[in-house]
Amino acid sequence: VRGITHLGGTILGTTNRGNPLKWPIRADGGAVTYMDRSQEVVDALERLEVDALISIGGDGSLEIAHALSQKGLKVVGVPKTIDNDLEATSVTFGFHTAVDTATDAIGKLHSTAESHQRVMVVEVMGRNAGWIALSSGVAGTADVILIPEIPYDMDIVCEKIQDRYASGREFAIVVVAEGAFPKGSKPLFKQEDDGQKRLGGMAEQVAHDIHERTGRETRHLVLGHLQRGGGP
């Protein structure tokens, strides 16, 4: 590891595509079924004389690692995810880096929001966990923080923003976790080119709702994969 320990990213390359526990098989008619091919993974590693597998990742990677361990493979699981949504560890690798990035972005938005007297809505990652939104929102002194664990009430959100403007502070910062959703509703998903559904679109929706209800000039920003980069 000499010369690479200070670098971000994955020097060997990586992927989160393909799940041997649920491998898609497409029939001639187009129908897709799924099969468990995890035993083939174990057999291949044995042929290669691999003694053990070190799995570095989030819940998906570690779910696969656990299944392989159940088949007799020696496995070490390393909790690596910006979402900080794994048990058996207080903080996952990558979480603090993502929070630092999000906090920095929120801090920079304060000046433009104040200059133009706007409401700025920032969407951060985290999937169904609100750790990044909560931590970066508190550190960045956001006025409203919306997380998946607590479905929000848009009336209360708008009331908070109006109260802030009425007090003479004519701008506001709203941090939204990508998995957040209002009471009585569900998280928003976007259809990707590969056919998969991914969380996203909440910042745009929240910004639209705030503008419609308050008349305040509102902008939204999605930080996206910027949160996944950078050195450790």
Predicted segments with their positions:
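Extracytoplasmic ligand/sensor domains, especially the bilobed periplasmic-binding protein
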Residues: T15, A67, K71-E87, H96
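Acidic, glycine-rich active-site loops and adjacent beta-strand->loop/helix elements
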Residues: N16-G18, D59-G60, T81-N84, G126-N128, ...
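Accessory alpha-helical/coil subdomains and C-terminal extensions
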Residues: A44, A52-G57, E63-A67, K74, ...
